[in-house]
Amino acid sequence: MSHPDTTSKDAVFQWRGIPQPGQLLPLGLQHVVAAVVGVITPAILVADTCGLSSADKTLMIQVSLILTALATLLQLFPIFHRIGSGLPVIMGISFAYIPTLQAIGGEFGLPTILGAEIVGGIVAIVFGVLVKWIRPLFPPLVTGTVIFTIGLSLYPTAVKYMAGGAGSEWFGNAKSWAVALITLAVVVFLNHFTKGITKLASILIGILTGYVIAYFLGIVDLSGVGSAAWVALPRPMPFDIQFVPAACVSLGIVYVVNAVQTIGDLSSTTMGGMDRMPTDKELSGGIVGQGVMSILGAFFGGLPAATYSQNVGIVTVNRVINRAVFALAALILLVAGLVPKFASLLTTIPQCVIGGATISVFATITMTGIRMITEGGFTPRKSSVVGLSVALGVGITQVSGCLAGEGFPAWVNTVFGSSSVVVAALMAVLLNLILPKEPSANG
């Protein structure tokens, strides 16, 4: 990465250097557009699950934007060359955590989520330090199975939102479904029939379209926006923090899985933009930095950060790796996070619009898992690993209380009975270790 400084048009293809202003702004905005929906949506989903007020939901969105910016800057400018990867990546709030966060939040509330995040961040740091030795436990077969399960477990959330949001006066209303389906149609059309910025911003444009329609149908409530401040800094410890061991274990497992996904994203970034694989030091620093920011985020009421695959995709297509481009994107998100009125406006997005926009994201997550699973062909061994892991993971969570009877301590139901991702991850690792290998298998 020791490229010479340059101010030519080729500067955007070098890690260091000063890109021309005419290149810098559009390239930075491209990454903002790709990331912003993914940054704010998890905060909205978790806030709704935990029953937060409009003001607290605004705060969570604000903190999500700020933490995304700081986490990205940490990756671009590592501390002590150990905390952060020093690679061109955009960080954000990951959907991969949502099923487990919703399970914890629904049972224990937001304080327990934040406590589990701190423990999860420590787990990520340990994983990053030991990445060379732990990585072999998570081949594409195992990681793909978990990602596939994550996608499946998010579908009910998307459908509830498309219907108007459980408990909402608009739930099951034909207007909610009309707005959701129009939003989805716009996303699908732009994603498959257009190119360039409109394709990249398909979800954002879909949300804007759905929002306008919902506004004229009387679904949008703007009453809380006027009271929000124009500029404000987030304060530490806005919520209590509690540590529930079972919740910490559940989320810690997801942090491990997400660390493996980070390895994939960093590898795709360096292969696509730098024609090389990442070094062990870069992988370690990237995961450690992710853990550090998750711990910091918990103290400010934020959610876990992770690398953003959609932004990795941009790098592999345009091969722009200049850190000034990514730093500008981070600064734009940071400024947005310092404006509570903007965050408050985002809380007015109707749930049917969010559902219509995100169900395509969740479908993509599911298919990404399938693509990883089928890498190198599909064998009877893979069928057993995936089938049994998903069957137990999804099946157990569909039968309420099946692990809460006599003979089971309460923590068993909390860890294994509420999150399909945790069960699927453990089963996939175990089966991949004990089932006999096949010469043609890639797992």
Task: Label the predicted regions.
Residues 104-223, 330, 335-443:
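Membrane-embedded alpha-helical modules
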Residues 102, 191, 311-322, 326, ...:
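Interfacial segments of multi-pass membrane proteins
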Residues 59, 82-95, 136-145, 199-204, ...:
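Short, non-helical or kinked segments that cap or interrupt transmembrane helices
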Residues 22-35, 172-184, 201-202, 217, ...:
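Hydrophobic, membrane-embedded alpha-helices of multi-pass small-molecule transporters
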Residues 1-89, 96-104:
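N-terminal signal-anchor module of multipass membrane proteins
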